[in-house]
């Protein structure tokens, strides 16, 4: 069986590698080819749980959706989830290996090459094309010796590379030239094309620069993509900088999301952002908080540390004040834990803080332990069937002054019967371990209509928004954007030249 490969690397983080890889996945899938995305090592706090209960990075999930296939942990065999500025949880083939500091991991990571290549080779055996993505920049010369994700991975897969450069930040030609010239000659020769991304204005103004960079590097500029408002899941928390900080006064409902320092799985909020009557804003300070209709405390990779920070910056007090003044509150995973009475970490799983008081809005107590729960789950709340996934270390017990949020009926395809989450006695505070809770359109609209009625507004009917249908539309737009702004003859030739038996 023959297989083709193409790899996107960037001059910096957030250059657009993930998006362009997704675009190519959709283009090739639309041609009828079997396509799989691949990123050997991903560092992200946004993760996903597969049908088999394996944890993987979110970017390869939306790339798999673009490729019209189910997410498979082989698409992202190594996932690093930072827990502090120096330490990360190392996840190999979907399961926790251990926590490691940066120096230890740098010395260790080449031992992971057999697992990486097993994942890559088995995907290559099953697909027509593998679309690879690098991480950050391939020109980090202090890290290149043990590289397993950029040119190191390109060499292992013998994949041609497209270099993606973000012009919106300025200095695009310097970043292209510097990135290429810092590479060994062998790696420079692997780059077959350059794409300039996020351009605003008249492309003709770039032509002289494109010709000059082609002459300086010997590599053709095969495309210039415009800045786009296409709405695809973001993986890097740097993308939160672009999120709204103020309410859209044209929308009926004000939803405020606490922008935690160690925020994770902020993709949970995406389904609310596309609702016709909802304005979503991200809150960094107590002054910004106000009294939203719905206040969301999202997931956290270090719940104890984020709770300490919330108290220091005054947001904890602001949350309590907002609730007193009428805001409904939903906590997801770490946010659920924060809403409780107490958090215990006797063995230092998350942090040196052995115990601390929560915000006290739910009658729950959480104890962190080494066992990590990773499941795809199906739950029921009242008459609503809810689908989501769990990623947490520790257990939460409810007291007498709260009721379960839902009953888990299935995990990883197997029957289950256990309770999840908690709801305050007055129904104004909800906590759940289910990520993706707002991706359930009927329950979400029910919740939003409750908020509307509380404000004296009529509920919206026949306005449920399917996140899956919405995403599919965005992938088609992304594929079209790529095809219209890239020299597809040159791109197809690069892909064709990569063919291997």
From Swiss-Prot:
Active site: 333, 435
Presence of the UniProt keyword Magnesium in the record: no
Gene Ontology molecular functions: ABC-type vitamin B12 transporter activity; catalytic activity
GO BP terms: cobalamin biosynthetic process
Keywords from the UniProt entry: Cobalamin biosynthesis, Glutamine amidotransferase
Pfam families hit by this protein: CbiA (PF01656), GATase_3 (PF07685)
PROSITE patterns according to UniProt: GATASE_COBBQ
CDD domains: CobQ_N, GATase1_CobQ
Pathway entry: Cofactor biosynthesis; adenosylcobalamin biosynthesis
Domain GATase cobBQ-type: 252-443
InterPro entries, sorted: Class_I_gatase-like, CobQ/CobB/MinD/ParA_Nub-bd_dom, CobQ_GATase1, CobQ_N, CobQ_synth, GATase_3, P-loop_NTPase
Signal peptide annotation: none
Keyword Cell inner membrane: no
HAMAP family, per database record: CobQ (MF_00028)
Job of this protein: Catalyzes amidations at positions B, D, E, and G on adenosylcobyrinic A,C-diamide. NH(2) groups are provided by glutamine, and one molecule of ATP is hydrogenolyzed for each amidation.
Similarity comment: Belongs to the CobB/CobQ family. CobQ subfamily.
Protein name: Cobyric acid synthase
Annotated source species: Limosilactobacillus reuteri (strain DSM 20016) (Lactobacillus reuteri)
Organism lineage: Bacteria, Bacillati, Bacillota, Bacilli, Lactobacillales
Gene it is expressed from: cobQ
């Amino acid at each position: 069986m023959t297989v083709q490969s193409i790899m996107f690397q960037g001059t910096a983080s957030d250059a657009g590698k993930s998006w362009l890889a997704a675009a190519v996945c959709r283009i090739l899938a639309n041609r009828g080819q079997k396509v799989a995305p691949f990123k050997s090592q991903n560092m992200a706090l946004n993760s996903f749980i597969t049908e088999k209960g394996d944890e993987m990075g979110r970017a390869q999930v939306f790339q798999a959706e673009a490729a019209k296939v189910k997410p498979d942990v082989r698409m992202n065999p190594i996932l690093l989830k930072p827990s502090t500025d120096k330490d990360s949880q190392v996840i190999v083939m979907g399961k926790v290996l251990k926590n490691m500091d940066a120096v230890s991991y740098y010395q260790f990571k080449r031992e992971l090459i057999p697992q990486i290549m097993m994942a890559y080779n088995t995907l290559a055996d099953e697909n027509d094309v593998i679309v690879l993505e690098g991480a950050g920049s391939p020109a980090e010369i202090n890290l290149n010796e043990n590289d397993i994700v950029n040119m190191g991975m390109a060499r292992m897969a013998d994949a041609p590379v497209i270099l993606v450069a973000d012009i919106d930040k300025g200095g695009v030609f310097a970043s292209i030239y510097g990135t290429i010239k810092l590479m060994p000659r062998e790696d420079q020769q692997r780059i077959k094309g350059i794409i300039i991304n996020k351009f605003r204005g008249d492309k003709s103004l770039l032509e002289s620069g494109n010709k000059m960079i082609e002459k300086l590097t010997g590599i053709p500029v095969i495309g210039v993509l415009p800045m786009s408002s296409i709405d695809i899941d973001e993986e890097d928390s740097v993308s939160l900088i672009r999120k709204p900080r103020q309410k859209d006064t044209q929308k009926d409902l004000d939803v405020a999301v606490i922008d935690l320092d160690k925020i994770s799985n902020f993709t949970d909020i995406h389904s609310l952002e596309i609702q016709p009557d909802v304005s979503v804003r991200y809150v960094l300070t107590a002054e910004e908080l106000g009294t939203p209709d719905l206040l969301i405390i999202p997931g956290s990779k270090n719940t104890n540390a984020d709770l300490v920070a919330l108290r220091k910056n005054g947001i904890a007090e602001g949350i309590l004040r907002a609730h007193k003044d009428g805001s409904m509150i939903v906590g997801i995973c770490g946010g659920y834990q924060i809403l409780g009475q107490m958090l215990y970490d006797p063995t230092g799983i998350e942090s040196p803080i052995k115990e601390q008081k929560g915000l006290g809005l739910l009658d729950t107590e959480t104890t962190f332990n080494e066992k990590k729960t990773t499941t795809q789950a199906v739950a029921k709340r009242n008459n609503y069937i809810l689908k989501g996934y769990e990623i947490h270390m520790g257990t939460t017990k409810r007291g007498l002054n709260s009721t379960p949020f839902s009953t888990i009926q299935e995990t990883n395809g197997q029957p289950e019967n256990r309770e999840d989450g908690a709801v305050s006695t007055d129904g104004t505070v909800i906590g759940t371990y289910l990520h993706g809770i707002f991706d359930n359109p009927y329950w979400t609209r029910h919740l939003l209509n409750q908020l509307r009625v509380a404000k004296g507004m009529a509920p919206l009917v026949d306005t449920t928004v399917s996140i899956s249908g919405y995403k599919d539309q965005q992938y088609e737009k992304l594929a079209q954007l790529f095809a219209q702004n890239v020299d597809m003859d040159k791109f197809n030739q690069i892909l064709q030249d990569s063919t291997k038996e």
